[in-house]
Amino acid sequence: MKRFILFILIFAMIPLCPAKAEPIKWVDFGVPYESLKYAMDVDIATNEEEKHISWIDILAVSACRTGGKCPLSSVKKAAQDLKGDKSPEEILGNLYKFYSYYQEAYDAVLGGLLGSYAIESAGEWKSTYGLKAYFPIAAGYGYSHCDDFGNSRSFGFARKHLGHDLMGSLGTPVVAVEGGVVEAIGWNRYGGWRIGIRSFDSRRYYYYAHLQKDAPFAPGLKTGDIVQAGDLIGFMGRTGYSDKENTNNIETVHLHFGMQLIFDESQKECNNEIWVDVYNIVRLLADHRSSVKKTRDGWQRIYPYRDLDTEEFTPTGNKNFQTGFDKAPFLCYTFMDK
């Protein structure tokens, strides 16, 4: 009898322990460039107002109404609705059941692109709120691109292209789009010389591939290092499609740039990885480019940068990295040529 009562008590307590929510398993990010730009501009314009309208919220409301298509007209209406006194739940009514998904998904894609940062120019630090992520190709270097996400690839096995290719010149400096930790650096039979950088919030994994033969990476860069948005990380090339290391086997010089979303660590390397189309994000970043220069001693970032939103991270042994300014990490470096 006592055992029966104990069983009943345990069974009754089960509902009090909520089950862990399943992580998002798929994101189809198809927000048009014009909609991204409009939502971002509203976010920036209202940053210091009494009611700050987040571009994530704008896009999530629009996505609920349009099944993720987010045409500009819908985004404008969503922004106008959110400027009022109603909450997203009141605005959306029955469609609110989709809101948490789109809010989480879009925050995972865009969460590290907008925020507070500071740039040093003429010996003075100037802080601002706005687009703090950078275009992956350094300022002053030409490029061309098109929306090629999902195109077929055949090396090794038939598959879809899960990134975005930017064509350019051999040796073009490649910079980090967003700050984070270098998780992978070295050779891959598909991507050639490549770098993988995990965002500080761990939700985005940025992949930069087909880097230059012989000198693919910023000198001294290694696994575990901290990089900030706009930092030099490598040089454009055409390596890859080979089991033999340091081989040029890609016909056209280009950068393969990709973004993987990770809602749970089990998604990092699996058969159902979540890679999103970054074409319109790259277009959004095109007017925000980092300037680097070649000096007698190596490569140098012209305008030092500080991310004012990120907690302090301690680099793993690279003395070129420094931290400070109210514990916000920043980088003012010279990479020495070897």
Language-model-derived ranges and their functions:
Residues 1-8:
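N-terminal Sec-pathway targeting helices
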Residues 3, 18-100:
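Cationic-aromatic interfacial patches
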Residues 85-193, 229, 282-338:
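Surface-exposed, glycine-biased beta-strand/turn segments
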Residues 177-220, 244-252:
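Zn2+-dependent peptidoglycan hydrolase active-site motif and core
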Residues 225-297:
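Conserved, short, structured surface segments that act as functional micro-motifs
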